[in-house]
A protein has these predicted regions:
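Short polar catalytic/cofactor-binding loops
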Residues: 18-24
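Active-site metal-binding loops of divalent metal-dependent hydrolases
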Residues: 19, 55, 178-179
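Active-site catalytic loop in hydrolytic enzyme cores
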Residues: 90, 107-180
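Hydrophobic positions in the central parallel beta-sheet of the AAA+
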Residues: 17, 50, 172-174
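Conserved beta-strand scaffold positions in the cores of enzyme catalytic domains, especially
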Residues: 14-16, 128
């Protein structure tokens, strides 16, 4: 495979899908319906890969601090795909369009990550990446009208920055503050 990639022009048409705000009261299903609509729109315009934002399934909940982190468990995914996100995977497979999806992940052993998956055009997950550089603060700052408590809600990944074979080439992922 190494030789086949070298010198071969690879062009992938990528769509950046901007969702707009998700309210705290919005359901996961309504967020996924918006993602599916954006995927179809991108596919209609010839996209092969749709990149969705960080934490695309929920409001950006680190803006609000809760004393008991377990009360925020409903923001986290424990499996991917899940019953709520399966329609997005099905649409990707049907339209033969891959995607990258950001979400909050709660592992079976209780770890919380800001995670991104890369999904190929057949609807299969080919890579999972967890945010390395977590910004913000880890405790409540009561004088702030909005928090930036990512360090409270997420732990940094120790897996580093990976690169995977996908979309006819090599592709990596990073999330927001990882760009530094």
């Amino acid at each position: 495979m190494k030789g086949a990639l070298r010198g071969t022009p690879r062009v992938v048409r990528v769509a950046a899908a901007q969702m707009g705000p998700i309210q705290r009261t919005d359901s996961r299903e309504s967020a996924v319906a918006r993602l599916v609509a954006l995927l179809h729109r991108a596919a209609d315009q010839g996209a092969q890969l749709v990149v969705f934002p960080e934490l695309a399934l929920t409001t950006f909940f680190p803006r609000w601090f809760v004393d008991d982190i377990a009360t925020a468990d409903h923001y986290y995914e424990t499996s991917m795909p899940s019953p709520a996100t399966q329609p997005l995977f099905d649409a990707a497979k049907q339209r033969k369009v891959g995607f990258s999806l950001g979400y909050a992940e709660l592992t079976a052993d209780g770890h919380r990550f800001n995670t991104q998956v890369l999904v190929e055009r057949d609807g299969a997950i080919v890579a999972k990446y967890r945010k390395v550089h977590i910004p913000g603060h880890a405790s409540n700052e009561p004088n702030r009208p909005f928090q930036h408590a990512e360090r409270y809600y997420f732990e940094p990944s120790d897996e580093g920055f990976g690169v995977w074979n996908a979309f006819g080439g090599r592709i990596g992922m990073m999330i927001c503050n990882d760009r530094r």
